[in-house]
Regions:
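Append "Primarily bacterial transcriptional regulators
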Residues: 7-8, 40, 184, 257, ...
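Amphipathic helical "hinge" segments at domain boundaries
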Residues: 45-110, 114-115, 196
């Protein structure tokens, strides 16, 4: 990798002159600029973004903090962020918060130290983590899992929850286990409330359960006690786990219990039976959030909350009447 000294030697100028030309913080004659540019191209020199940011008090770095990079949904989100950022001349510094406040705070501190111009984040584990995000005083856009009052790019979760409920009703659901995640987040609350409303209006029995506390033994108890014939999951990864448990319990999907997921991650077509699920535009969520953030950084427009449509993908894990 070429160094700034090699660029200076190639262009026959001082290192200080190369630095001024790159950072734009001093006068450099056009003829000299042309020589430096030719040297940069010839040597394929890549300026250090962090070093430049320290000189310019501004960077082309964006911090990206996601809650679970093992979930393919967030992998797609990250790809959308990265592709849009690179197309606009920015770089990404990524952190996997893993719903761990200590990790989240460490990544936020790293974004600050490295002079990130803005931050894109999804679910944070605690109110204190959100406070520290806002304390950076950098423009930020949240993806999918917002708290009240934050600028967010998310899918239409009211529509998503409605589609989940309508789909299992089409399969003649009579007793439903409705799984949910942290309802303090608007996205989880919206899809939960929407599904529950549709089911209750259809006079269907509904049992609710915090997803993270569900075990195979508890699932078996619910099925025996409430004659559960349909399960709504808040994401595809949980839906796969539920279907594995049902297989272990010798319960047929969808004949005895139908299962519907949320996200439509790539593995949804690889499982047997293939998973009926709500498709979230994960890649587009990442792109939209990045575009909004960069537009704000460049003074084009202030970010506004955006809602993207979802759709239902019917596969083999639900019944069709």
């Amino acid at each position: 990798v070429a160094t700034i000294k090699e660029v200076a030697h190639y262009a026959k100028v001082s290192v200080a002159t190369v630095s001024r030309a790159i950072n734009g913080n001093g006068y450099v004659k056009q003829e000299t600029r042309d020589k430096i540019e030719a040297a940069i191209q010839a040597l394929n020199y890549q300026p250090n973004e962090v070093a430049r940011s320290l000189n310019m008090k501004k960077s082309k770095l964006i911090g990206l903090l996601l809650p679970d990079m093992s979930n393919p949904f967030f992998t797609l989100v990250a790809r959308g962020v990265e592709d849009m950022a690179m197309a606009r001349g920015y770089h990404i510094m990524i952190g996997n918060g893993a719903m761990d406040e200590t990790k989240e705070l460490n990544y936020l501190s790293m974004f600050k130290v490295n002079q990130c111009s803005g931050v894109i984040a999804s679910q944070l584990s605690t109110p204190h983590a959100f406070e520290q995000l806002h304390a950076l005083q950098s423009p930020c856009v949240l993806i999918d899992r917002a708290a009240e009052g934050d600028t967010c790019v998310e899918a239409d979760h009211v529509q998503g929850g409605t589609l989940q409920a309508e789909t299992i009703l089409q399969g003649n659901a009579t007793s439903v286990l409705l799984l949910y995640q942290n309802l303090d987040y608007t996205s989880f609350r919206a899809r939960f409330d929407a599904a529950k409303k549709v089911l209750e209006e259809a006079n269907v029995s509904v049992v609710t359960q915090l997803e993270g506390a569900l075990t195979e033994k508890l699932l078996e108890r619910y099925i025996d006690t409430y004659t559960i014939d349909s399960i709504i999951c808040s994401n595809d990864v949980m839906a796969f786990k539920v279907m594995q448990w049902l297989h272990t319990l010798n319960i047929k999907v969808p004949e005895e219990v139908q299962v519907v997921g949320y996200d439509d991650i790539p593995f949804a077509t690889m499982f047997i039976p293939t998973l009926t699920t709500v498709r979230q535009p994960a890649y587009e969520l990442g792109q939209q959030a990045t575009q909004q953030l960069i537009d704000e950084l460049e003074g084009r427009v202030a970010p506004t909350s955006t809602i993207l449509e979802v759709d239902m993908v019917h596969r083999a894990s639900t019944r069709r009447s």
